[in-house]
């Protein structure tokens, strides 16, 4: 074996080893985004001057991500402002001083707090002058990447997110709706759950809730663009068997009440799932805009002290509920269980 060949082989090995280390570091550095939402408030001061308060919330996986990456992405957010008709960029707004807090949104009674699940939230607020003109405006933020282990998204580790909101033309005074609650930190397998995805609207507009397919944005090579791309935005690609109306493996399938925002699900497979829920706002029957919640559900095994549950043989549940009419006869199977070792005596 020649000396030249051995040198080249050694260099090739070193490059391969470096590449593997780099990709591992990149995976830990990039795959950390759990979800987010963007909305705004129309603010009028005493002199009649109109401003818009932009509110952006972003969630990170603080269990598996590099803490330095979270701090980097949490310290600054870029909001692109675009003409809603021509898609022309108007300006880019920097949001700083995000307020950080660890969230623990638990939606179960009698559950033992699990380990290995951690979500941190950054909230940004800034009031700026914006002129919606006659076309309206699109506000957007882009960030990459989603958790690589996301089960329902194709190539999730390279798939980013776009969070956007629409401001109607200036002759329409409007503040966007906003969700009342933080999505769940975790979801328990085989445990029926109803989540409150309701929103409130400062203008009293009519609200309608539905599932949607989240948007892509950013890239592994430019995870947090300081000039977000203009609309229109591409949709993420679902893995086989998943869709906007079937985002989490479950039986019965997930269901959202279009009038109340009540979201019921009984997940039957552990995993990580991207979930898109949006609230549409209508005024006098005219669609004004929407607020989008793009969030990651983590389905895990949970330990319960008490599980109260039943089913009806031959019955079909719709949205977690069984329907009966007067005169019907139903037989209930009690499938509750009691973990005596964990339930305190009373």
Q: What is each PLM-predicted segment?
A:
Residues 1-34, 324-327, 333-335:
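Bacterial Sec-dependent N-terminal signal peptides
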Residues 28-331, 335-346:
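Long, compositionally biased, intrinsically disordered segments
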């Amino acid at each position: 074996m020649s000396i030249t060949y051995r040198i080249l082989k050694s260099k090739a090995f070193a490059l391969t080893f470096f590449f593997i280390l780099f990709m591992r570091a990149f995976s830990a550095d990039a795959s950390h985004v759990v979800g987010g939402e963007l909305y705004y408030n129309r603010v009028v001061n005493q002199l009649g001057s109109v401003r818009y308060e932009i509110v952006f919330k972003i969630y990170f996986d603080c269990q598996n991500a590099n803490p330095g990456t979270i701090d980097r992405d949490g310290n600054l957010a870029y909001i692109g402002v675009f003409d809603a008709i021509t898609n022309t960029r108007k300006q880019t707004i920097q949001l700083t001083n995000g307020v950080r807090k660890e969230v623990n949104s638990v939606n179960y009674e009698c559950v033992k707090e699990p380990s290995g699940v951690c979500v941190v939230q950054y909230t940004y607020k800034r009031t700026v002058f914006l002129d919606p003109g006659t076309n309206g405006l699109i506000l957007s933020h882009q960030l990459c990447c989603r958790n690589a282990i996301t089960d329902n998204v194709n190539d999730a580790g390279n798939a980013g997110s776009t969070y956007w909101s629409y401001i109607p033309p200036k002759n329409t005074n409007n503040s966007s709706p906003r969700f009342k609650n933080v999505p769940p930190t975790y979801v328990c397998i085989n445990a029926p759950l109803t989540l409150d995805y309701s929103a409130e609207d400062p203008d009293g507009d009519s609200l309608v809730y539905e599932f949607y397919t989240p948007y892509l944005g950013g890239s592994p090579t430019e995870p947090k663009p300081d000039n977000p791309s203009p609309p229109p935005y591409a949709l993420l690609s679902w893995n086989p068997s998943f869709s906007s109306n079937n985002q989490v493996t479950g039986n019965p399938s997930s269901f959202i009440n279009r009038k109340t925002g009540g979201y019921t699900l009984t997940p039957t497979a552990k995993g990580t799932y991207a979930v898109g829920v949006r609230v549409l706002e209508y005024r006098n029957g005219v669609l004004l805009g929407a607020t989008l919640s793009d969030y990651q559900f983590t389905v895990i095994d949970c330990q319960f002290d008490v599980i109260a549950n039943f089913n009806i043989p031959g019955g079909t549940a719709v949205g977690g509920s069984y329907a009966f009419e007067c005169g019907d006869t139903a037989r209930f199977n009690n499938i509750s269980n009691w973990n005596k070792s964990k339930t305190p005596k009373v």
